[in-house]
Structures are given as C-alpha cells and as structure tokens.
Amino acid sequence: MSVFGRATFSAARFAEARPTYPASLFKTILGYYNHEDPHGTLLDLGCGHGIVARELSPRFARAIAIDPSDGMIRLAMQTHAEHTKISFRQGYAEDLSFLPAHSVDMAAAGQAAHWFNYPQVWPELSRVVKPGGSLAFWGYKDNILIGHRRANEIFEKFCYGEGEVLPGVEGMNQYWERPGRDILRDLLADVKPPESEWDKIKRITYNVDKDTKEIAGPETAWMRKKLTLGQFEAYVRTFTGYQGWMDAHLDKKSRAEGGEGDIVDFMFDQILEAEPEWKEKGDRWRDIEVESVWGTYILLATRK
C-alpha cells in the first residue's frame, strides 16, 4: 500500500509542511497553454490537497481534480469548498474512464507524475485530451540549504545513505517508494510523451549543484525560498521515506511527541554538530532562517 493510503499518514500535516508553488511557475504553465479566455476543462492528476486546481482553475470553465488518497480528497474538499467550479473525486491517472474522449483542455500534475504507470497513463491521456490541448507535469526533488555544505551532506546521508547512518540506526534510503522516488530524482528524464500523439514537447529542468552551489535564474530554479530550520524539519517529516521508516520502527517517537527521538531528530543532532553557529542558539535553533533551493522539472506537451 502507498504511504498516502496508510492509517498513519496525515494529509493535513503533509499539506501544512510542503513548500508552496510560486506564481512564476503557473505563469510558465499558462503561457504554454496560451488561451486567454476562461473556457474548457482542466484535469488535475494527483491533486493532493487541491493547490494546483485552485491556482489554475480561473483560466477554465471547470476543473476536475483526482487523487488516489481518500484523505487528500477529503482535505481538498474541506479546504476549497468555496471553489464551486472544482470537483474533487478519488481516482487514478491510469483510469480516466469517467471522462469522454477529447473532453480535457489541459491535464496537469504537480509533484505527482513520478508515481504514474505510463503504459496505462499515456493511452488514457491521449484519449481524453482534445487535439490542441496541453499536458503540464512538474515537480521538485531534494533541496539544499544554500551555503551549508556540511548540513547538506548529512541530509543526503540520512535520506539516501546505505546501511547504518549512525551506530545501530539505519537511514531512510530503503523506505522510499520506488521506482517513483528514483524517477523523481532523475527529474523524469525517461518520461517521454509518445511523439505519435504529442508534439511541441518542452522541458525545463534544474538540477541542484551541491558542489558549486551556483543558483540559476528564477525561470529555471523556480522552487527557491527562505524557511526556518523548524520548517525544514517539518518538511522532512512529510517524506515518504520518513513515513516508511517510522512504520518500520513503531517503538520510535519524535522528541516533540515525548519519545527518545526518531530518524529526523537524530539527523538534526548531527547537523547541529556540523554547524556550530546553529548549535550556539540552543533550543532556539528551529527559529534560524536559511535559504533553500530544490531541483525541479517542468514537462509540457501539446496533443496532436
């Protein structure tokens, strides 16, 4: 079962801690779509708590948003009850049988396309997206804290290191849901719309350079923001790798929950040791503000 369907998964906590999309991203998406008057139908695949449908729906007559997680759909309906042109339903990108042929003007997927089973998804999208309609997939992978190489190395180790990351403590690597995570880390390089049915294919990718820390311009490196270390800590706890680790270590609780610590607590212990200026803040280290940038991709295509 996917992490998002487990009883231990909190849709509300996930939604609260995840980074938001900048306006520049939606400007890029709608600039490619290039229809000025609100008309037609938007299909939001893997809608989560409904952010994409909310932001894009003003350019459409109606929006249909689907997600496999019942908890996410309930949260989306509660959060966006006033957006009457959006309809939310539980569903999968692999089964769009509820939609007529050529009924969709844009199919969008924000931070969801790495989960898709493409041998099933491409035929469905080719059927429901009308000729001249658009496809827009985008997402983000691992972030870095700009100017903090040692913290980034520890973050990488705890997320993807093999075996034990501390004596007697295994990292999160084996608990990521694969192949989805690997597809995302590769920025969907191998996800290719069939050229027999799609054209005007465009990719915008940004792979974070952990060594030089050179940051691209805002169109390419569009997922960049300031956040506190406390917000970064909460974000890490939304990772599917973290959720999988917790499900495998039911005896572990975070210190915030009265336990002796979980994998994220242990990781930040190491990060604070590596960043003395942060450690000097004592219990107030979570208030420290840092700048972060994510590796990102945008994949755009037009139905022939």
Residue ranges and their predicted role:
Residues D105-P119:
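A short SAM/SAH-binding and catalytic strip from SAM-dependent methyltransferases
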Residues L187-K304:
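Conserved Class I S-adenosyl-L-methionine
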Residues G132-K226:
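Conserved catalytic/acceptor-binding region of the Class I
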Residues P19-G40:
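Conserved alpha-helix/loop element of class I SAM-dependent methyltransferases that forms part
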Residues A7-P19:
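Class I SAM-dependent methyltransferase Rossmann-like catalytic core
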Residues Q120-G132:
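A short glycine-rich, Lys/Arg-flanked "PGG" loop and its adjoining helix->strand segment in the class I
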Residues S97-A107:
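A short acidic, Gly/Pro-enriched loop at the edge of an enzyme's catalytic core
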Residues T41-L96:
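Class I SAM-dependent methyltransferase SAM/SAH-binding core
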